[in-house]
């Protein structure tokens, strides 16, 4: 289970915004096929991803990257599916981040000789170049 809640004040409109985003993940491979890539689990219900252009306009942030996870993981005779990588850049100070990611310390395990999947995490990249990696945080203050 991976969930991200990101919010703040829109720099152009002054209105508060909140993004509640279950993360797309991959499913394990099986006997005859690779695993599915970038899918929501049944626990997410009728949830859809928001197009980048709408996300940027509504929420006053930049989506720097939205792609399949480029990290290695899940390789085997039938490869496990890939999750996503989403990079956001906030445009105004005073934002917050809450997240909870499972499989951060112990990645999804490989079966029948397949390799383990990649771990789940959030990276905070500061303007000074420092990087912090987290799997759980609540109301973490974000600076521009």
Q: At which residue positions do the language-model features occur?
A:
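Glycine/proline-enriched, intrinsically flexible loops and inter-domain linkers
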Residues: 1-144
């Amino acid at each position: 289970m991976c969930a991200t809640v990101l919010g703040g004040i829109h720099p152009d409109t002054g209105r508060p915004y909140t993004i509640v985003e279950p993360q797309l993940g991959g499913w394990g491979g099986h006997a005859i096929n690779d695993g599915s890539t970038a899918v929501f689990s049944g626990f997410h219900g009728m949830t859809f991803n928001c197009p980048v252009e709408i996300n940027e306009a509504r929420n006053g942030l930049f989506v720097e990257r939205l792609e399949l996870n480029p990290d290695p993981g899940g390789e085997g005779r039938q490869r496990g599916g890939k999750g996503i990588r989403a990079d956001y850049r906030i445009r105004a100070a005073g934002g917050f981040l809450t997240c909870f990611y499972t499989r951060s310390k112990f990645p999804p395990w490989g079966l029948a000789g397949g390799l383990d999947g990649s771990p789940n995490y959030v990276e905070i990249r500061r303007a000074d170049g420092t990087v912090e990696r987290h799997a759980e945080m609540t109301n973490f203050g974000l600076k521009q």
